[in-house]
Amino acid sequence: MKVLLTGATGFLGKYVINELKSNNYKVIAFGRNEKIGKTLVDENVEFYKGDIENLDDLFRASEGCSAVIHAAALSTVWGKWENFYNINVLGTKNIIRLCEEKKLKLVFVSSPSIYAGAKDQLDVREDEAPEENNLNFYIKSKIMAEKLIRSSSLNYMIIRPRGLFGIGDTSIIPRLLDLNKKIGIPLFADGKQKVDITCVENVAYALRLALENNEYLGGIYNITNDEPIEFKEILTLFFNEIGTKGKYLKWNYNLIFPLVSFMERVYKFFRIEKEPPLTKYTLYLMRYSQTLNIDKAKKELGYYPKISVIEGVKKYVEHSRKNDRNS
């Protein structure tokens, strides 16, 4: 089976490629990063440099494909609405048109950030997603993209993977470790809020399961490691493996929130493109619990995480040490 993978040059992309190749799929890696594309070609992966905003690129790249895994997205907490709309909404429209005309199955990588809000949320199920959430443009665009897919005539599946981490991550863990070195990590509620994180290999595995499952077409699935853990405990796992101590800053949410909210308004008013030091979305992530229920993925996809959080942490730290020694 031949599969078109958008976002192939991103963090998740290489893991999906490995998962599919090791299960005898032929992958067309579609992305914009030529440098990473060249490394994929060196590893005998067919790479197509293209843009999901360009329908012709998609039609040419998908020749002979039976399915599409759509992982490409602009996924940041700040930016211009038109950029999120063009990539995450119009880009998805192009994917839908491609799949409808060529009769391809679609597996869409969405985001559980659509659940985000100013409250604790435990054991959240897929049908608890709001119809609208304007906390940031990324969330708004992902909800719009999901609606487009759900209203289409496609054979589709949607997954919402939570807090991806692993080797190659340039977002969650590196930022926290860097923050710890510089000033310390802000803590609310003594870091006892519960969160889910997910080994990126498990997400790639879940995508393959969704690709292969034709019994529950139209299904939407939360994906996590199924190991809810306190925020401070995650940090402690990493620090213990690294052999360092965590530096923590106790912040008062009631004092910080008005400042962050005001700062966002100022940035929006003056159309400042640079991301503010802190956003309401990031603040909610740090302050409130959010864990996801994955019973549906277990029952319908047969998804059970292959790699535990502690295994993922050990692999990440070991790889980082090797890189440090070689640099």
Regions found by a protein language model. Name each.
Residues V3-N23:
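N-terminal Rossmann NAD(P)H-binding glycine-rich loop of SDR-like oxidoreductase domains
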Residues K49-I87, L98:
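NAD(P)H-binding glycine-rich loop region in Rossmannoid oxidoreductase-like domains
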Residues L90-F137:
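Conserved Rossmann-fold NAD(P)-dependent oxidoreductase catalytic core, especially the SDR/UDP-sugar
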Residues Y115, M157-R175:
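Flexible, glycine-rich beta-alpha linker
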Residues N133-I159:
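Active-site Tyr-X1-5-Lys
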Residues K140, M144, D169-R175, A189-L211, ...:
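Substrate-positioning beta->alpha
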Residues L209-E275, I294, K314-V317, R325:
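Mid/C-terminal beta-alpha module of Rossmann-like enzyme folds, strongest
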Residues L292-E300, Y304-S327:
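Amphipathic terminal alpha-helices
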